[in-house]
Amino acid sequence: MAEEKYIMAIDQGTTSSRAIIFDKKGNKIGSSQKEFTQYFPNAGWVEHNANEIWNSVQSVIAGSLIESGVKPTDIAGIGITNQRETTVVWDKATGLPIYNAIVWQSRQTTPIADQLKEDGYSEMIHEKTGLIIDAYFSATKVRWILDHVEGAQERAENGELMFGTIDTWLVWKLTGDTHVTDYSNASRTMLFNIHDLDWDQEILDLLNIPRVMLPKVVSNSEVYGLTKNYHFYGSEVPIAGMAGDQQAALFGQMAFEPGMVKNTYGTGSFIVMNTGEEPQLSKNNLLTTIGYGINGKVYYALEGSIFVAGSAIQWLRDGLKMLQTAAESEAVAKASTGHNEVYVVPAFTGLGAPYWDSQARGAVFGLTRGTTREDFVKATLQAVAYQVRDIIDTMKEDTGIDIPVLKVDGGAANNDFLMQFQADILNTAVQRAHNLETTALGAAFLAGLAVGFWKDLEEIKAFQEEGQQFEPIMAEEEREDLYEGWQQAVAATQQFKRKNK
């Protein structure tokens, strides 16, 4: 009898790395997770040590094999999904990064982005890349590293340095020599022309980024290379699927049809709509991005990015010591007897879509002497839902497509209070994924399809099980009154800006 085969997904996130092993039916049979250090060298800066990320990935590969009892030889393929935009530049000869990885949340490159806007490049960059000019994307991060590491520009021009987002870094480490990225990750660099499906020479010239340091761009489902046997316990396993975390979640939620929308509540919150085979440029500051490329076709998406979602709950736990665990936030919020008069605007690193205000900072409104810890926790959860409404309303306006149901996943989707309030404030049904591992599952599906582990999308669709659905129950007047209060709070937050001295 043939040994059963499995697919491994490596999910390299903002605060931790995970490896999950799935069987033929898409069931999780083993996993491992490891956190790594966040570095905050200055206000608004966020960095990671790329070698610590690589170490954490090696650790979870081992951990998932140990927990599941699966042999390395039984892994048919590996799928990678990753925190997007985070930028690594490393030495081609030694494999050592020349600077910390600059994380997607980091605002240290804002002056470069501001200069591009001032010089009038916003429209050109939006039309070519689908993105708005912002420090969020990789382009300004690469420029910053080349500016701040002595001799880096010259070495990059000489072909001695390599650039990659985290997917690229991990494939390069695992295979020892393959320098690739996929359509979804490339589309988040602000260097990639989403119409021509190639790096854009005009933007590279504008930022003086040498093309020689960029990876080759490939589809989301094909064999990129084999693991070096010494990195995978003697086995050479095909790395066969790759997608940025939000696009992987779109695929894992099986949002294969145009108009389907998913929201992942992670560190940030990311609402993504499949718009089919034609890119749709937003008039309202949403991002046009590539969902995935598979079987010779490319599917585009519209995305709204919220920088702070789950991390606001972590802040309540770690910064303010209001919670022992993140999960406790649900019970604490439900115990609030206030009337929703408190608003928390968690603009810790500025505001994402649709405001794109990097100077805004967090604020709390509506406090009285009677405000309690419970009210504060509830308002923080509600802030996540309000931000999602900002984006869903914008999406409807941009596309003219009604959104009858919002598919949700990610850690905070476990929070019943948040999900019910989300349904209420949107006046839309919210459907929780039965399997909240949609990001890892998406990467596994992409890899499994490439190696013939699964035949086609139809076979995958058969695994879909619906989770709990939350229906809106709030009165229209209350909903609009609460949302108006949120809009006032955001406007007030944007008024209060202090330049970092």
Curated annotation (Swiss-Prot):
The keyword Cell cycle does not apply. One of its GO terms (molecular function) is glycerol kinase activity. It comes from the Bacteria. Sn-glycerol 3-phosphate binds at T14, R84, E85, Y136, D245. The keyword Kinase applies. Belongs to the FGGY kinase family. This is Glycerol kinase. It comes from Enterococcus faecalis (strain ATCC 700802 / V583).
